[in-house]
């Protein structure tokens, strides 16, 4: 759905692309979730709807038992941002983490201490710095961990953090930030942090997904009307649990569905 109304000052753009507030509306969130300011302040609604959507989705679950909602057991929240600010030398600004403990008597909705958000933040910052420094010739900076009053870390019913990954205003940060390999490394570090946090909370072992295969090729097979697939597994020097042991090849014919796979 598009809004071409000149009175709103909006361009020819999909509602879901106009920010979290309108994305939540068109995703079917209830009016109180996306319009707490009743249409008078889109900016504040856009900021708050992110947390309110989490609370509505998780409401009624064991992690948010007292709030009405859809009962989805969401265990944590991470808001990924980029930061402003620049340096006059060639140094990297780096990553900042934000959490909030001074709210609701220091408790989350399930009764957990809000310092769980600090633990979550620490995991993200540690993993990001380790993985980026190990992959790139860059002295990636771990900045502060702020215990401050931000909507995205105050309002969620579950442990939450804001990760200011890098400065979009600083040349040294963006020199890496535009590199697809950096984007993959940072994204994988975030994924590993989430996996480690959730498994630790449940006292479970975890296994990180292996890296994509290398040298993939397709050749005509020795038998008629057959193809031979070949590839090489890739070990992850940053994660010992990510060693590949086997692969599953799924097949589909035409527009049909994929089969159950062959190991």
Q: Model-found features: residue ranges?
A:
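Single conserved hydrophobic/aromatic residue that forms the stacking wall/gate
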Residues: 1-14
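Second-shell loop/turn segments in exported
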Residues: 12, 36-44, 65, 105-115, ...
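Functional beta-strand-loop-alpha-helix junction segments that form "active/interaction loops"
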Residues: 12-66
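Loop/turn elements at helix/coil->beta-strand transitions in domains of secreted/extracellular proteins
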Residues: 26-32, 72-76, 157-161
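Active-site-adjacent mobile loop/cap segments within catalytic or ligand-binding domains
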Residues: 61, 77-107, 135-204
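Active-site-adjacent substrate-binding region
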Residues: 113-146
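Pro/Thr/Ser/Gly-rich low-complexity, intrinsically disordered linker/stalk tracts
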Residues: 197-241
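Recognizes extended acidic, P/S/T-rich segments that occur
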Residues: 242-263
